């Protein structure tokens, strides 16, 4: 799996499976993470596991992926059901849909660097973290 887009696709398949141990197949052991991805491979696995505990049916769908050399930029939509505690909010049974932007760098068929920005405001709004008067009327999710 040398192609950066193929590595990216496999990464999201693993996220959808919730099989964080399989990340070792597509991520370098010394992976560097930024923003929501955590600082390293261990933190990336923990982040994905935490999301999967709170949203067991979480699904990622790649909307756009643009590759240049060893970099792939993606716009990803996520959806799932809030069934477990997330950020101090107990499971609500609510369906959520939010988006994220990821930038990955691939070397020798493995992700060596990942940056992730997630629309946490929309997610928190959907699980009831904000009082109704502070909730926006529209979401940027499609």
Indicate residue ranges for each PLM-predicted region.
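C-terminal and inter-domain tail/linker signature
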Residues: 1-142
């Amino acid at each position: 799996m040398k192609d950066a887009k193929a590595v990216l696709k496999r990464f999201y398949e693993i996220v959808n499976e919730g099989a964080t141990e399989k990340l070792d197949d597509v991520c370098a052991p010394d992976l560097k993470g930024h923003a929501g991805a955590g600082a390293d491979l261990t933190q990336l696995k923990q982040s994905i596991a935490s999301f999967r505990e709170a949203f067991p049916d979480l699904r990622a769908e790649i909307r756009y992926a643009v590759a240049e050399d060893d970099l792939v930029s993606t716009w990803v939509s996520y959806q799932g059901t809030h069934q477990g505690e997330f950020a101090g909010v107990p499971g609500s049974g609510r369906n959520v849909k939010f988006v994220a932007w990821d930038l990955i760098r691939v070397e020798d068929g493995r992700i060596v660097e990942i940056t992730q920005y997630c629309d946490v405001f929309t997610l928190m709004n959907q699980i009831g973290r904000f009082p109704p008067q502070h909730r926006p009327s529209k979401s940027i999710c499609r």
